[in-house]
Amino acid sequence: MIILAVGIGFGFFVALLSLLAIKAGFGSGYNSLVSVSSFDKRITLATFILLAGPSEDIFFIGFVQNTLTPSLGWGAIIIYLLLFIAYHYANVISGAETKKEFLGTLPIRLMASLLLSLSFYLTRSLLYGLIVHNLIDTLSYVALLYSARQKPTQISSQ
């Protein structure tokens, strides 16, 4: 239960950092997520909640880390972290983030993924990680939406 409490606190911390980063001009490649209809925003939010975090956690932690843990022990966590960060580098390739933005968010991504990985390693349950991952993704998206409401002319002009 302590893992969940730490994770929830961390989720709110990441959302606050996301809001500050967006206000500072980082993540402009994500503007397409907010410059759409209300229906599209709801679909995006549902995708974060139902697909993004859960599919990442099921594959990277539930399959990769779980498969490697018997032979590598804690080393499986390191492999998971490397794969998870490499996977998120797709944000740079797709143009959603610059390399500078990716590197700027790397410490937070590492801390979040370490928390998710450790929660599974210690509890043998994906539930805590799924809750925390969804919270981080959802609150970060809400921060993006909130920031867009504060500056509607900047978002719509890009």
PLM feature spans:
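Membrane-water interface of transmembrane alpha-helices
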Residues: 12-27, 87-90
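Interfacial transmembrane-helix boundary/kink motif in multi-pass membrane proteins
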Residues: 1-17, 30-42, 75
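Transmembrane helix-loop-helix hairpins at the membrane interface
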Residues: 38-158
